[in-house]
Each structure stands twice: as structure tokens, then as C-alpha cells.
Amino acid sequence: MSFVEICLVLATIGLLLFKWSTGTFKAFEGRNLYFEKPYPFLGNMAASALQKASFQKQISEFYNRTRHHKLVGLFNLRTPMIQINDPQLIKKICVKDFDHFPNHQTLNIPNERLVNDMLNVMRDQHWRNMRSVLTPVFTSAKMRNMFTLMNESFAQCLEHLKSSQPIAAGENAFELDMKVLCNKLSNDVIATTAFGLKVNSFDDPENEFHTIGKTLAFSRGLPFLKFMMCLLAPKVFNFFKLTIFDSTNVEYFVRLVVDAMQYREKHNITRPDMIQLLMEAKKESKDNWTDDEIVAQCFIFFFAAFENNSNLICTTAYELLRNLDIQERLYEEVKETQEALKGAPLTYDAAQEMTYMDMVISESLRKWTLSAAADRLCAKDYTLTDDEGTKLFEFKAGDNINIPICGLHWDERFFPQPQRFDPERFSERRKKDLIPYTYLPFGVGPRSCIGNRYAVMQAKGMLYNLMLNYKIEASPRTTRDMWESARGFNIIPTTGFWMQLVSRK
């Protein structure tokens, strides 16, 4: 083949790829919907897809440019989505007319074991059945028992911190990457509360559960690239029978749960963890659950809890070191709680009574939302109208919907001075002024996160123990502008969550 022929072949392939990459970009033509010009392959998500900005920043900036439109077209890579910018319309779609938008965006990975059986991926009646069974698992009574397991992990974390190397001889302070610490904590909490396994990743960071668990975080590395390919070219991804996660690692968690269930049934053992609660739920359910369906509900902890719970603690600690007056007020509440407990470990009920802690965490979830957006899928044709009955838009079955959570959270019309960390927004006096459907830290409607209590419980427990023993200060390596330095799906600075802990004793 001559050089000219090779060039022609390459040019043809390039042209076909370009045509394919832009093949969905006419989706909004003739639908009376404003949209910004998308880039080939990357749509309106170029900066986050290329790791130039966080997904939160990308969505927030897009929202700011288009918020004067109640609805706007958005291209998430090649996928056309209809973004809802108006809180009242969000209520209509996600709550009032939920039956038209009951599912999340389709994630079609037939070769991926467990993923399709997770609650947040399930659809229609299958999801409804599983949701009704799992909802009692996350009640206060069940969380109260599970909190005792978390306390063991908090204690292990504090022991590890006590052995940390001081900055200099005679100093009572040391520097650490809070993200590394909290990832280990999240790992151990998930191990004990979801999988019935006791591990100590502080003393043994190379333990099997931690080593394999880290491979399931798809917000970075090879899993991130595979996930992007799955979204960008699902047919190609499935044609080659690719998977996001290594099948050997997935099998490890399957065996862990199945073996634990068999052992407990054989020896009549009970433990207040997720496996036990699922075993009890299975007995009461009319559905014949498969082992994979049970394992998948434990497996989801790595998707919904591992990174998110760790990030919630990190972002809150970051704001506390930047706002020492808020940190001092929180410390006073923590001391009062400790005195009321008379030296006993923190309990679930005592954690619930810490109102200022609630305010601090709520504001952290507002400013540094764990999820940049929520999504829905239109199940049947739907005419969207305003309160006066005026037609706004015609949705078609198969339309993907985007709810810009971080955009709403940073909108000064709803949260004045949104860049300011102000827990008072969530005080008893002021939280009644919040506009409904503008604060959505765990999603909205029946499809909202079922494990929100679990996430807040872990954050409260860790922050209580941290504040009780240490003052959090900035270190030379502390990120100055997290909004600009964060990358990927989560708010994680590229340099890490470095800070300094100063012992209070």
C-alpha cells in the first residue's frame, strides 16, 4: 500500500470517527431548547473529561452560564441531556410526576458482575421491590446498632494518630494527608459494617480487603478510563466484553459475603452489620433473591460510601482549618457532649443531639456537594407545564435528564455568598428560609440516596473524635484554592488534603 493510500485510509477513519463523535449533536434541533455548542467526543464536558477541572466545577460553570433558562440542553460526552435549572420543575419531574421519570440513566454493562444488581442501577418494579426491602435497613434503630461497629474503627484511627511523627522534636503537632487517613477509615468502616470483616488498615495498610477495595474506586486511574469508554462508546465496550473492574477482585467480595452468610446460618451467629440485615430482609421478602443481588447491596458501599464518606470528612476538616471560629464553636459542643457521656464512647443518640455538628456538616454538603448532579430517564412521553398550565417542553421516552446539584448549591439567589462557609444557613432560625429543591446533597425524590444517614453518621463520629483530641490547622502543603485544584468526579485536590493536627493534650 502506497503512502498516499495509507493517508487516504487514515483520513477516512478519522472522518468516520468525527462523524460518530458528533452523531448525537443534533438531538435538540427542532425542540425549542437552548444548548451550547458541544466538542467532538467530549460534548460540554471537555474540561472534566480531560482532568482539567472537577466535574463539580464543570457542571457549576455550565449552570451559571445557562441558569436564566429553566431548561437547557447539555451534552455529557456524546449523551444529550436536558438540564433542569428551575427548582419547581425539579420537584415536578423528580417527585410529583415521578412515574414518568422513575429510573436513572441506563448503564448497560452486561458483562459486569454485581453492578447491574445494585439498587441505584435497578429499574422499575425490580428497583421498587428492592428499595422497599432495604429502606428499613437504614432506620435509626439499625443505624444505632451499626454505630457501635464504627466506634471500633474510630478508636483504631485515633491510636494510629497518636503514633504519628511530630513535625519537630518537642512539638505536639504533625502533618498528614487527611484523604489517605480517611480512605483507610472508610475502608475499615465498610469492612465491618457492610461485609462483617474486622480489618485495621492503619496498622496493616496492605491487608487484602483494603488492597482490593482501592481498585473499585472508579473516580481515577484505569477504572476511570474504562468508565469513560463505557459512557462514550458502550457498544464497543460491550462488543469486546470489557469490564470496568477485574473479575477476580469482584469474585473476592462475592465469596466474602456468601461464605459469611453460610457460616452464620450454620452456626446461628448474628452481628449488627449489613450482611445480617440483608439475611433477615431476604427471609421476610417474597422475592427469591440471588446471592449476587445480596452481595451487590454490600458492593454498593464502595461506590456510594468509600470516596464520598471520606471526602465529606476531608472537606469539612478543610473548612474548619480555614474558619477557626467555627472550629472552636464545634469543639465546645464536642466537649459538652463528652461531659454528658461521662467518658463513654460517642453513641448514635448523642451524635444526633449535636445540633452545631449538624449545621457544619450540612454546610459542607452544600458547598462541597458529594455528587455534582443527579440524573433521570424519561420512561414515557411527558408534557412539562408551569404552574399556570403553560407548556414548557415536550419530553420523549428515552430523554436523559440532568439535575445540576452543585450549580444550585452555588447559586447566590438561593445561598447568598455561596463561596462563604456559613453553618448558620442551617440553624433552626434560618433553615426554614431555604427554598425547596435548591439543597439536594443526597439527591431528590424517591430515587434519592438511601444511605444518607450512614454517611452523616460516619462523618459525625470521626469529626467528634478528631475535634476532641486535635486542633486542625493549615500546613505548608494545604491547598489554597480547592475549587481550582480539584479534579475528577470528586472534590479531591491534586496535591491531596494536607493539613496539620495539633494535640489538645
From Swiss-Prot:
Its cofactor is heme. GO terms for molecular function: heme binding; iron ion binding; monooxygenase activity; oxidoreductase activity, acting on paired donors, with incorporation or reduction of molecular oxygen. One of its GO terms (cellular component) is endoplasmic reticulum membrane. It is an enzyme of class 1 (oxidoreductase). It holds the Pfam family p450. Disulfide bonds: none annotated. Its EC number is 1.14.-.-. Heme binds at C449. It is found in: Endoplasmic reticulum membrane; Microsome membrane. The keyword Endoplasmic reticulum applies. InterPro entries: Cyt_P450 (IPR001128), Cyt_P450_CS (IPR017972), Cyt_P450_E_grp-IV (IPR002403), Cyt_P450_sf (IPR036396), Insect_CytP450_Detox (IPR050476). May be involved in the metabolism of insect hormones and in the breakdown of synthetic insecticides. Belongs to the cytochrome P450 family. PANTHER family: CYP9F3-RELATED, CYTOCHROME P450. This is Cytochrome P450 9b1. It comes from Drosophila melanogaster (Fruit fly). The lineage of its organism: Eukaryota, Metazoa, Ecdysozoa, Arthropoda, Hexapoda. The gene is Cyp9b1.
